[in-house]
């Protein structure tokens, strides 16, 4: 985002759609500024996802429910999002946060299995795109945390007797709300260098992809060194894309 900001491209972006950590970045950026977004990540505690109790203790106490509750805690991340995400101060035209409906809150992981079956095999979509500016502050905060809640790794976010998980479970490239909003040019920032986006039945829309040349490494590594490496890699890859456009 810093490279897109410095090149002047970001100011022309009217809609943003994100899933998982992309949803968090979009929500914090849209609620504050590019400088504040960077400050959040450069100052995040290295043990941000550490649980108060060891996993073995929780397994002995809760058995399989411990897995359903998540291996790691989202408390610190949730607190950070509470401080920096506000639909009241959103300055982008519209931001969509992607979440995956994991089914009945009382069904545990079986609810997610059922939702996956319905989404992928029965084509009954279980992905939800939430417009940040239409949510209350509490709803916006819960939506961003849910979008980052990787099943088993983190606990689901519960709402209206359903459990909601990482948006990437059902849509890792959430461009649908952008197309429905009338966007005719979309920039996709990929975090998986092995993934190739294959647009289907998209007419009149130009798709750009910014892809990483290097592996991003551990997603739960919040050491200062790793965060700096990720930041630099993202900046260089985006800048390379920006510079390549100048000569097209």
Predicted segments with their positions:
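Patatin-like phospholipase
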Residues: 1-19, 27-248
């Amino acid at each position: 985002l810093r490279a897109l900001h410095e090149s002047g491209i970001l100011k022309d972006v009217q809609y943003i759609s994100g899933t998982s950590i992309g949803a968090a970045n979009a929500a914090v950026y849209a609620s504050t500024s590019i400088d504040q977004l960077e400050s959040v990540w450069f100052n995040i505690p290295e043990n941000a996802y550490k649980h108060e109790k060891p996993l073995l203790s929780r397994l002995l106490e809760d058995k399989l429910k411990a897995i359903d509750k998540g291996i790691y805690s989202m408390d610190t991340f949730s607190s950070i999002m509470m401080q920096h995400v506000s639909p009241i101060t959103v300055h982008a035209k519209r931001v969509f946060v992607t979440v995956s409906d994991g089914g009945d809150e009382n069904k545990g992981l079986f609810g997610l299995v059922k939702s996956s079956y319905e989404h992928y095999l029965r084509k009954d979509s279980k992905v939800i795109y939430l417009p940040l500016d239409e949510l209350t502050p509490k709803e916006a905060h819960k939506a961003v945390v849910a979008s980052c809640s990787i099943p088993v790794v983190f606990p689901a976010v519960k709402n209206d007797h359903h459990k909601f998980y990482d948006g990437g479970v059902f849509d890792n490239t959430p461009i649908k709300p952008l197309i429905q909003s009338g966007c005719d040019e979309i920039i996709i920032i990929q975090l998986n260098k092995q993934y190739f986006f294959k647009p289907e039945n998209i007419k009149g829309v130009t798709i750009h992809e910014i892809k990483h040349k290097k592996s991003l490494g551990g997603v739960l590594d919040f050491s200062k060194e790793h965060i700096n490496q990720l930041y630099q890699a993202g900046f260089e890859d985006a800048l390379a894309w920006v510079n390549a456009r100048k000569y097209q």
